[in-house]
């Protein structure tokens, strides 16, 4: 897949997820086969006001290319300025505009998926960012605002006309949030309506899902988010499936724990032990999903405060569950 001038080496893309796709997790996913990674979403206003924390979210790991920096906002001028700042700070190969986030505090400000209620404004923002950005621009969007306003096809054509180089389409409306089933038909319709690359997103939890969504929609790539939480090997598995090779099983629990520990150690190096451990309370638990008799250790994980706590818990898992 080629996005503007940027060559993406595989059809597998890691979706941006706030509080999840930090530098550490992106590095793990990249090593396991993700062809494109995207930062957590960053507020355009915060970048324009030189907020240090927001700028820190844009840090890429060495060799993390191609990579995309995602920004959100609803003011064309601020978004254009933020795109330039994000590209300069991160060294990202792409800038992604968030038009899909369904969270209330984002939508209430007119950002994220709220832009799907005003396609003309969304197109103006996209055009402003395209004209200002030194790198190609993409947009992540949803099927529509609700079942009464399914406008992904219309908006996708407007965004292409505005100069956007690729689209990622999630098959749910904002009203659905993450409930119900993703509608892949809309993604297929978007793919048929535009000439730029389309990434299919929604309900990709297995290698088989990745193959199915690509075949059904005709999309150029598959973007997965929640499906790889605790299972970054999904990229490895999906790549095998796409190549018609046997799908490798999930690694043994010992290896999964090693990967979880490494991810948390990388996060601690990047953002400090305290923040990394607070975030690890949910992240480590994801790696234990489906593991019999892991409840005791999940309870300990949500109470850990230091790296030493993490090492102690991991030793217990190795002793009792492996």
Language-model segments: what does each one mean?
Residues 1-13, 47-66, 101-111, 130-138, ...:
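N-terminal small/glycine-rich loop or linker at the start of catalytic domains
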Residues 17-19, 42-44, 72-74, 100-102, ...:
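Active-site beta-loop-alpha junctions enriched in small/polar residues
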Residues 2, 17-93:
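Glycine-rich, positively charged N-terminal anion/phosphate-binding segment
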Residues 12-16, 37-39, 67-71, 95, ...:
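Hydrophobic faces of well-ordered beta-strands that scaffold small-molecule active sites
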Residues 116:
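Aromatic- and acidic-residue-enriched carbohydrate-binding clefts of CAZyme catalytic domains
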Residues 80-111, 119-196:
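Alpha/beta enzyme core
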Residues 8, 12, 18, 23-24, ...:
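Alpha/beta catalytic cores of nucleotide-metabolism and tRNA/nucleoside-modifying enzymes
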């Amino acid at each position: 897949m080629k996005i503007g001038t940027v060559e993406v080496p595989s059809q597998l893309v890691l979706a941006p997820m706030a509080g999840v796709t930090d530098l550490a997790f992106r590095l793990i996913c990249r090593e396991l086969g993700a062809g494109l990674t995207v930062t957590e979403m960053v507020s355009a206003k915060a970048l324009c006001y030189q907020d240090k924390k927001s700028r820190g979210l844009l840090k890429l790991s060495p060799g993390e290319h191609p990579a995309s920096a995602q920004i959100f906002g609803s003011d064309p001028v601020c978004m254009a300025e933020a795109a330039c700042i994000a590209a300069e700070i991160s060294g990202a190969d792409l800038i992604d505009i968030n038009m899909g986030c369904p969270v209330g505090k984002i939508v209430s400000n007119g950002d994220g998926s709220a832009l799907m209620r005003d396609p003309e404004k969304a197109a103006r923002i996209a055009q402003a960012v395209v004209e200002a950005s030194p790198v190609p621009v993409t947009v992540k969007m949803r099927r529509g605002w609700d079942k009464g306003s399914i406008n992904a096809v219309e908006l996708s054509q407007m965004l292409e006309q505005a100069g956007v180089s690729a689209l990622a389409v999630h098959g749910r409306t904002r009203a659905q949030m993450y409930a119900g089933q993703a509608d892949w038909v809309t993604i297929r319709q978007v793919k048929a309506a535009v000439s730029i690359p389309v990434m299919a997103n929604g309900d990709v939890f297995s290698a088989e899902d990745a193959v199915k969504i690509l075949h059904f929609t005709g999309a150029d790539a598959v973007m997965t988010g929640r499906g790889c939480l605790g299972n970054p090997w999904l990229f490895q598995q999906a790549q095998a499936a796409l190549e018609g090779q046997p799908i490798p099983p999930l690694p043994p629990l010992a290896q999964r724990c090693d990967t979880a520990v490494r991810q948390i150690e990388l996060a601690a190096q990047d953002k400090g032990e305290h923040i990394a451990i607070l975030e690890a309370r949910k992240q480590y638990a994801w790696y234990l999903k489906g593991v019999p008799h892991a409840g005791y250790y999940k309870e300990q994980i949500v109470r850990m405060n230091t790296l030493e706590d993490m090492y102690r818990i991991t030793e217990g898992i190795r002793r009792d569950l492996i």
